[in-house]
């Protein structure tokens, strides 16, 4: 279990940007891990082109949920809905199917910090908390028709 909570995960968990709420979110969603009780509340706004223009979130999560949320918060603004769905799908595949670290062809390094979460694949009971931010973001995108 110690390999899960390495220094980089703890650093990401301690430095989570965009905490709080938006004045006028386009969509908002909650995700909860039934196993550990971790919670994420996400709010975002999209431009007409389907790119995220603003983002905020509130967390009551373990270090893994905080670390994945930290990476999301650093990378989401300016990302397209299409890319966010792709990254979420790749993240699930990384954890559940031993897939590669999420990467976009046109921006191969953008989501590279998710690699630090690859050891979670061996701990199935930690998948849900690690994926909370992705579930909530995709819920928001779906609400907005993307």
Give each language-model segment a name:
Residues 1-20, 79-146:
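C-terminal binding/interaction regions
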Residues 19-59:
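Structured beta-strand/loop patches that form or line metal/cofactor-binding pockets in enzymes
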Residues 34-36, 64, 125-126:
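Secondary-structure capping and boundary motifs in well-ordered enzyme cores
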Residues 44, 74-76, 86-88:
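Short C-terminal domain-edge/linker segments immediately following a structured domain
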Residues 60-66:
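Short, thiol/selenol-centered motifs that function as redox-active sites or metal-ligating centers
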Residues 66-67, 86:
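Alpha-helical macromolecular-interaction surfaces
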Residues 68-80:
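Alpha-helical support elements that line or immediately flank enzyme active sites
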């Amino acid at each position: 279990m110690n390999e899960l909570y390495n220094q980089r995960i703890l650093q990401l968990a301690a430095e989570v940007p965009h905490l709080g709420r938006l004045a006028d979110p386009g969509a908002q969603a909650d995700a909860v891990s039934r196993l550990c009780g971790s919670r994420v509340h996400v709010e975002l706004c999209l431009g007409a082109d389907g790119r995220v223009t603003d983002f905020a979130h509130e967390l009551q999560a373990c270090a893994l949920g905080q670390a994945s949320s930290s990476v999301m918060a650093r990378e989401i603004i300016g990302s397209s809905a299409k890319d966010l769905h792709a990254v979420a799908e790749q993240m699930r595949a990384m954890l559940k199917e031993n897939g590669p670290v999420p990467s976009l062809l046109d921006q191969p390094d953008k989501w590279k910090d998710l690699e630090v979460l690859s050891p979670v694949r061996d701990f199935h009971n930690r998948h849900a908390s690690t994926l909370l931010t992705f579930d909530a973001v995709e819920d928001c995108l779906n609400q907005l028709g993307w």
